[in-house]
Design a protein with these regions (language model features):
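Composition-driven recognition of glycine/serine/threonine/acidic- and proline-rich low-complexity segments
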Residues: 2-205
Length: 205
């Protein structure tokens, strides 16, 4: 995404960029079609919910936290699709969502999703963002854990995602209220290359 001087990037734009990273990484990693609702839900705080709650912190140009909550059916669908695409047979797969292998797989996927997001946003905003290692918890149905990052003016949002198998999972993003706008035109060295320019540099066009 290239910025113009008239364009303002808001927290919602950053959230949608994160959602695109989630769908791109998960769809590629699992071969499953992942989509998300066009509705952004504003909430008061981030919460780890059953059956598996995962989160990652990021700091730098802006700070925040990403939370993903997976019902057990969704966790097993994504885990199974990912491992089968890696070449594992049914007999080699974990059969319970509480298995450490399932949690580790979801953590690895979350790391890839947030890594894709931070790289993309760092380029777009000419900034730098660092992410923590993902943490995850398998939670019983009666347990929810509020998990908050210290922010001056928090904006917290939730988006619902859908898998090809008809299951759902939920993404929550907490970050300080912020806006970005271009103060001066980017020089060619600073400006992200367009797909056409990348192909031209590689001699493909």
């Amino acid at each position: 995404m290239l910025l113009s001087k008239q364009q303002v990037i808001t927290c919602d734009d950053i959230l949608l960029s994160l959602c695109d990273s989630v769908t791109d990484v998960l769809s590629t990693a699992t071969g499953d079609k992942i989509s998300y609702t066009p509705m952004i839900q504003k909430i008061n705080n981030t919460t780890l919910r059953p059956d598996i709650g995962t989160f990652v912190l990021f700091t730098g140009t802006f700070s925040g936290m990403v939370v993903l909550n997976f019902p057990k059916e969704t966790a097993m669908e994504l885990y199974t699709c990912y491992m089968k695409l890696m070449g594992l047979s049914d007999s080699d797969l974990a059969t319970n969502y509480t298995s450490e292998e399932v949690s580790n797989t979801l953590g690895e996927l979350l790391n890839q999703m947030v890594g894709n997001f931070t790289a993309k946003v760092s380029t777009t905003l000419n900034g730098r963002i660092h992410q923590s290692q993902p943490k995850m918890l398998a939670l019983p149905h009666q347990v929810e854990i509020n998990i908050n990052m210290t922010l001056d003016h928090p904006e917290v949002s939730r988006i619902t995602f859908f898998t090809n198998g008809g299951n759902v999972f939920y993404l929550e993003l907490a970050m300080d209220h912020t806006e970005f706008k271009l103060a001066r035109e980017l020089t060619p060295a600073e400006r992200p290359l367009t797909p056409e320019e990348i192909m031209a540099e590689a001699g493909l066009v």
